[in-house]
């Protein structure tokens, strides 16, 4: 289950969000800004093994389409 989003986009204690299955790990700092192509809040945490699918759902990386 993905963490709940907080109101501040760009960083959570869990790490940073990627836009999708092609970007498994993205370096993340407290200054990380949301990807302009990925306007959702940062709550689908890449370092926890989650990514967004094409519909914007937060899924486990291993569940990405092969």
From Swiss-Prot:
Presence of the UniProt keyword Repeat in the record: no
Single GO term (MF): serine-type endopeptidase inhibitor activity
Keywords, ordered alphabetically: Disulfide bond, Protease inhibitor, Secreted, Serine protease inhibitor
Chief place of localization: secreted
Gene Ontology CC annotations of this record: extracellular region
Disulfide bonds: 5-28, 16-44, 19-58, 21-38, 43-64
Gene3D superfamilies per record: Laminin (2.10.25.10)
Cell compartments where the protein resides: Secreted
Protein name, per record: Trypsin inhibitor
Species of provenance: Ascaris suum
């Amino acid at each position: 289950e993905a963490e709940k989003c907080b109101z501040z986009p760009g960083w959570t204690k869990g790490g940073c969000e990627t836009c999708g299955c092609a970007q498994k790990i993205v370096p993340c700092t407290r200054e990380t800004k949301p990807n302009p192509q990925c306007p959702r809040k940062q709550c689908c945490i890449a370092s926890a093994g989650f990514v967004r699918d094409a519909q914007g759902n937060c899924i486990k990386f291993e569940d990405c389409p092969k």
